[in-house]
Amino acid sequence: MYEDELERLEAPYPMQRIVHRRLPGDWEGPVFVWDVDKTYLETRFSQLRGLLRIPFELAIDKRPVAGVPALLHAQRRGYGDGERNPLFFISASPPQLAGPVTARMVQDGVEFDGITFKDVPSVLRRGRLGQLKEQVAFKISALLRLTEELPAGARLHLFGDDYEKDAQAYSLFAELAAGSLRGFELERRLIEVGAAKRYARAIATWAGPLPERDVVQGVWIRLVRDPSGGRIDGMPPIVRGWKTAEDAHAALRSAGVLP
């Protein structure tokens, strides 16, 4: 049923999304944005081998990362003194998996306000097979389109993993949003981390006129490939690693984001 709700966006990167909630202009507080693969679910839909099995892979059969549903519930609940905190997801899975992925969320009792999928069929139609496994341009584009619709009082907490380049994508987005990285230098940095030139240029063009907003308050990276944190060494201070959902929850409490 969720496939019928998908909105198609072509720029700055092909994506399809579902948005259930629009925040009022005077809303203030944390907004949690989660990667799906390897951060919420123990899966890798973005692998080419996995994509070839679609639609036979069902998200309902995938295990959530231990403790993550409870963490998502806590984030949604927040301090419990008003509206529930906004919760959005970004997935490199194709939009054909909207139903199964959201069914998994329902099974886990996870309330969400929106989810963005990579428009894999559109990327393939453009003859960009090599871009199926490159996620930085897609994730930054999804964050751009989400953030431009959020009120000025929103503060983003971005959750990803070190299996790919989530830390790089999120920290680049933080610089972009704050206005310290725009234009040619943004395009160059995107290409440097693997984005196709056409998408790097499209992102730089899209970001150019946007207001400067220091909107990213935290980048939270699940340490999958290197539990020692080696893959996020040297990243900006807002980037923090977590091995377990309990670790992440404790860090959010320490930062005053959660009770």
Annotate each language-model stretch with its function.
Residues 55-59, 87-89, 127-132:
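Surface-exposed cleft-lining segments at the edges of enzyme active sites
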Residues 46-68, 177-182, 186:
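Basic, amphipathic juxtamembrane/active-site segments
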